Amino acid sequence: MFHQRLGCSSISFRHQDLATALHTISGLGFEEIDLGALPGVCDHVPYVLDAEAVEAVAAVVRESGLRVRSVNGDVGDLNTTLDADARLERERHLEMLLSLAAKTGAKALVLPCGATDHEPVGSLEGDIETVGAQLIHASERAKEFGVELWTESLHYFRLCWNTERAQLLADQLTGSNVGIVMDFSHIVASGGNPVDFVERFGDRITHVHLRDAVPATETGPGNINLSIGNGQADFAAGLSALRDIGYTGHFSLELETRDVTHDERPAATAKAGIFITDLIQYPLHTIQGAS
């Protein structure tokens, strides 16, 4: 039913416990997931993560029969200076997330692009350097576990919240193995253009999140919590641009939406999956020529 490179994030069903969410996703016909491990966003993975919790989560995932493309996690504000004890705790949490990624067969761990604040802790340049250094360190640790390290940048609610700041971080990461996760909703909410994002970051894009959004206006902030088709994201143009650069990575419906009820959510997810599958399969010019 769905394209083999299109998965569904467990965040799409964050109101359900993990086993139920995975059963729902599998029942819709998806074969691949992103595993949400974001405190305050999705509780499918305990924030206090120890070896026992890692084994428990991995067992639930294995039982589902679903492939895991990435674990979407957080180890705290990467642009915040920590004391020795806090650094040790962050390192321990990173190790547990990497262990979870490895035990679930994930290709990568995804980390954010800074704190949930547009204002830097110090200078913008200094904060970007700190975030970059932390991500590069995490990517080196990831190698020990046989997985990759990606960052979701830009992210509308974090330090690297627009295209310009995402570019600054990408520049800082030049020469590293850190991949970039492209999220249509965050790009649009920030006033950016998905096609421009693809042209800027090209083959550094390793994964794509799919959700709709509208940009900020004079009277309100951007809204990233819209079902596909209910916002202003040009998925046809963005996916066509990815195809044009030879993108061979995967896509994930991360439908953290607030415009449908929980009862409506499975049908809305299936509808989005069919729509995106068609766009992945057929070039934009083919769709336009048929209209």
How should these model regions be labeled?
Residues 19-20, 60-63, 67, 79-180:
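Active-site acidic/histidine proton-transfer and metal-coordination neighborhood
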Residues 43-49, 84-87, 125-126, 222-228:
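Short glycine-enriched, charge-decorated loop/helix-capping segments at active-site entrances
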